[in-house]
């Protein structure tokens, strides 16, 4: 595309103080990425926590699942009164309803940057702040206090920056580095030979049911999926490292580290991420997981539309697609010239290029 789409934003363009004006405590900075990209069902933000600050007071959410991913620095996860040092590439997955109180505190020397993801907070959400009685009183006045939160044994740490008590050597089950669970086999669609990267499924490991999130490693010449659109669910892709082309309705936008692309459900915008560079690219890919029904449409794979049966989005909007066929350059070069005359023919032919015996996409 000649013009960068409004739903592609870099965290640097929307960063602002995390605390409201006049707040009693400085919580560093936040880039509200889903707000900038126009998504309403998800909350995705990048937090920048300077040394000696915390991202938020210790709290527990009744209904929200929370995912956090360390992009830079060495922040501490505060969980139920204990400190756990995190490193770049570590992720934290917290399921709903456990009552685990948590915070992110930067007790290190340099800035910490953390990617956080959950569903957007809904009316009726309940919150517990076990270390702050005045905050609990305020929550009660607002009708937001989670008064019957599970009682949990709390460690000695106060949850304030600079308090070094209660530091644990080991990691809780909620923390894992993405490389530890990265698949050793490439992902593919059923009955396809096209390799589409390695995945670390954080959501499956943590048994998350409301949000889906995984780390995806795309090698040169690979794409994250086939071009598609979703009827019901919002989704996003965030570039952790590397250079990619964001393909949207037949047009290409170069994206790099820190770029966020968010797609609203129902718009019919067909999309895929393509690695046409000479190095691996690492993505965070996520979205809603709680919809009972979701439907899809593949503009260049009519055979796939037939295969998915009731999940085919039959009355999808019909976009005016641009000239790009959605194929990585290296993959297109392997498609016979006679098949490259049509985007549909080229993509269907690419389905059967590659090696067999590889993990298939769901």
Residue ranges and their predicted role:
Residues 40, 80, 209, 247-249:
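Short strand-coil-strand connectors
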Residues 22, 26-28, 34, 38, ...:
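Polar/charged low-complexity regions in secreted precursors and cytosolic/nuclear IDRs
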Residues 26-32, 45-62, 99, 195-199, ...:
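Conserved short histidine dyad/triad with adjacent acidic residue
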Residues 81-97, 250-267:
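Short acidic-glycine-tyrosine-enriched beta hairpin
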